[in-house]
């Protein structure tokens, strides 16, 4: 390890740490850059109450790093991608999960119609249940708009609308799927603009953010992963998951596990 012992000052002063301060009062309430002896800024700033890390030249994926004695990363701040990763798995610290699903759903409106899946924790009372509704269409993708008043059961919107309060990024969506007959089940995740001013509850500007398709059967439970079309979804959007029995009206069950992080 380098030593100052028996060395001339001009051979080691660049290795001495100092704060960016013209006076000689030392560390105080003002946060100042930590510098080398020749006045070059480091990424660290100090005061008597604060420690700040800010890149001096370039953002990097390891601007701040805490690791174990053995070198395993425990906490890492990535200023290139605006991420904080934690734990041995180095998972984004703002990672969350959202579950959606349908159980033994009967597509009584006919084959090939898109049906929204339940997104929120709601309880059904009496004979009420989530029923089919052909309003979402039977095209390749679900409808991009919704007139709430045209729904068979508009109250279902409370169960199927996932309203975002923050900007999010989708990381991965996995599914489980089963059908009473051998059928192709198509699945989508859409985001819409929500009307909160005039036609309250109506949706517009629908965009597909993820999709999947699986050959489901009655004797198997298929697991798979969605293809992400567009990962970022902005705050105040309504997110809806859909399932579609492509060629049959047999009952089916699906489960979506949505891994995402807040931006």
What residue ranges belong to the model's regions?
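Polar, enzyme-active/binding microenvironments
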Residues: 1, 39, 89-263
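Intrinsic low-complexity, repeat-rich intrinsically disordered segments enriched
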Residues: 1-119, 183
């Amino acid at each position: 390890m380098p030593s100052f012992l028996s060395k001339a000052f001009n051979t080691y002063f660049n290795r001495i740490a100092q704060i960016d301060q013209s006076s000689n009062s030392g560390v105080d309430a003002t946060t100042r850059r930590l510098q080398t002896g020749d006045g070059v800024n480091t990424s660290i700033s100090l005061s008597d109450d604060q420690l700040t890390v800010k890149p001096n030249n370039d953002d990097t994926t390891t601007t701040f790093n805490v690791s174990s004695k053995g070198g395993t990363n425990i906490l890492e701040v990535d200023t290139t991608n605006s991420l904080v990763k934690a734990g041995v798995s180095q998972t984004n610290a703002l990672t969350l999960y959202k579950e959606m699903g349908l159980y033994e759903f009967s597509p009584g409106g006919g084959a090939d119609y898109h049906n929204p899946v339940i997104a929120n924790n709601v309880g059904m009372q009496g004979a009420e249940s989530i029923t089919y509704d052909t309003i979402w269409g039977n095209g390749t993708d679900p409808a991009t708009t919704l007139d709430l008043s045209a729904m068979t059961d508009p109250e279902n919107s409370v169960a199927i609308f996932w309203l975002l309060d923050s900007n999010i990024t989708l990381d991965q969506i996995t599914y489980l799927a089963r059908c009473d007959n051998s059928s192709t089940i198509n699945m989508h995740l859409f985001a819409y603009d929500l009307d909160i001013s005039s036609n309250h509850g109506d949706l517009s500007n629908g965009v597909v953010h993820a999709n999947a398709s699986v050959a489901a059967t009655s004797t198997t439970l298929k697991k798979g992963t969605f293809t992400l079309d567009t990962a970022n979804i902005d705050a105040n959007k309504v997110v809806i998951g859909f399932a579609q029995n492509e060629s049959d009206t047999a009952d089916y069950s699906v489960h979506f596990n949505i891994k995402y992080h807040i931006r």
